[in-house]
Amino acid sequence: MEPIHNPPPQTCSYSRPSTTYTSFKDASCGTKVTRIIIALFLIVISCGLILCAYTFRDLLDADYSAQEGPQQATKLLQQLDKVLTGPPLPIWDNEHLFQFSCLMQNKHRRVLPIDICNPLTKFNFLEYICNCLMTKQSVNVNETDMCELFCPPTCTPENYRRLLCTSSVFPFVMWHDPSADTQEAMLTKMDQTMSSGRVGNSHWVLVIVDIEHRCVTFFDSFYDYIASPQQMREQLEGLAASLGAIYPKEGGADSDQEELLSPFQVRIGSTVKVQSPGEFTCGAWCCQFLAWYLENPDFDLEEKVPTNPSERRALLADFISTTEQAMSRYSSLSWPTTD
């Protein structure tokens, strides 16, 4: 029996196709055209990616001009109202308010500086203002003994008495945080704000009592942060009636008693919102309003404040820069003297 010999397995051999690279110079005409088309296509794609990465702000700054109608430009300014450039304006707190009121007392003499040792809120300002004006009335008629006269810690009783006698304009500042719904909660919130060093939602508003003009003026740089103007007017009308009884009009013996005890006039000075969102300038705006009032009690706020937000900001920045140095003389918080 013969041995069986299996044939060797057949193998398949694959050969790679050879690729020949030719330079652009040696390539055929069709290859050159193809390469040019591919290069142009890649350039277009690259330019598209660059334009996609180009920010909209850069496109606005590009060297070209477009004619836009006045309505579109107005809308753009309205949008920019919330985007104000420049360094932040300094925050004026109660110490700055006191220093500025001392500066105004030195200039106008009829102004009583702001007592910052007794914090006022929307819960106690009516009673406090009435008590302050009643104290002035009793001092004028020599009914208050020196020992009974309450005066701020940084002012002597003798000096405080003289200031009360010579003052006819009484500015008061109220501190407010919308999260507090009682006087105790408001004072607690005030302590927390002072400890943290952050402004938070706190806000200053101004009340001016003018005995000579028989007027109570309220100012809120946010216009309606504490309450609506109508709600504030209703509260202030109660104060105005009390002040009318404390300081009756001068008249003869035959004058009508009801007319003599007529209430003070109530004026809501914050007719527009002057403080821009994101800025903590309520204290500085209160001081600016007080300065305008002392120059002319009948001034119109809308005539003083520009409608353009950038111009408003520049106006307040100029006011701050021109008064801060003069205010520094009262940095010790000592009350000015009448000598």
UniProtKB/Swiss-Prot annotation:
GO cellular component terms attached to this protein's record: extracellular region; host cell; membrane
Can you list the disulfide-bonded cysteine pairs? Answer: none
Q: Which residues form the active site?
A: 203, 220, 282
Q: Name where it's found.
A: Secreted; Host cell; Membrane
Q: What class of enzyme is it?
A: hydrolase
Q: Which residues cross the membrane?
A: 36-56
Q: Tell me, which GO biological process terms does this entry list?
A: protein deneddylation; protein deubiquitination; proteolysis
For this protein, the Enzyme Commission number is: 3.4.22.-
Q: Which UniProt keywords apply?
A: Hydrolase, Membrane, Protease, Secreted, Thiol protease, Transmembrane, Transmembrane helix, Ubl conjugation pathway, Virulence
Q: Does the keyword Transmembrane apply?
A: yes
GO MF annotation, one: deNEDDylase activity
Classify the source by domain of life: Bacteria
Please give the coiled-coil regions recorded for this protein. none
Topology relative to the membrane, per the entry? Single-pass membrane protein
InterPro entries documented for this protein: Papain-like_cys_pep_sf, Peptidase_C48_C
Q: What does this protein do?
A: Effector proteins function to alter host cell physiology and promote bacterial survival in host tissues. This protease possesses deubiquitinating and deneddylating activities.
Entry's family note: Belongs to the peptidase C48 family.
Record-given protein name: Deubiquitinase and deneddylase Dub2
Starting at the broadest rank, the lineage of the source organism is:
Bacteria, Pseudomonadati, Chlamydiota, Chlamydiia, Chlamydiales
Gene symbol of the encoding locus: cdu2
